[in-house]
Amino acid sequence: MGKRILTVGEPMGLLIAQEEGGLDEVKHFTSAIAGAEFNVAVGLTRLGHTVGYLTRVGRDPFGRQICRYMKQIGLDTGLTRVDQGRRTGFMLQSRTSQGDPDIYY
């Protein structure tokens, strides 16, 4: 049995461009979840630890996606709150074959 761990952070929706070009020109995106602490929580859960995630998401498509994924992988959602009055943050990421992608929050 793994250790019990608590992580605290801000998960975000992530839209990743599926073709190269400026984000104002791209037509197709893939939806994912981002956030440094979220990634740590997911990794620790996959290693067999019991992980709680203290956070707040909005009652919106990104918030629902995040909560659904947390439950799907077995991440403890007992300390995750859904806020009626706020939206979940998100970021846009460009696709590039050279250098770093453009990222907007």
Predicted features along the sequence, with ranges:
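Short, surface-exposed alpha-helical segments at coil->helix boundaries
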Residues: A34, F38, R64-C67
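Conserved N-terminal subdomain of the carbohydrate kinase-like
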Residues: T50, L54-Y105
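Gly/Ser/Thr-rich helix-start
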Residues: E10, G35-A36, R59, F90
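Positively charged, low-complexity intrinsically disordered leader regions
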Residues: M1-L23
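Short pre-catalytic strand/loop immediately N-terminal to key active-site residues, enriched for Gly-Thr
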Residues: D24-A34
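Alpha-helix C-terminal capping segments
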Residues: A32, N39-T50, R95
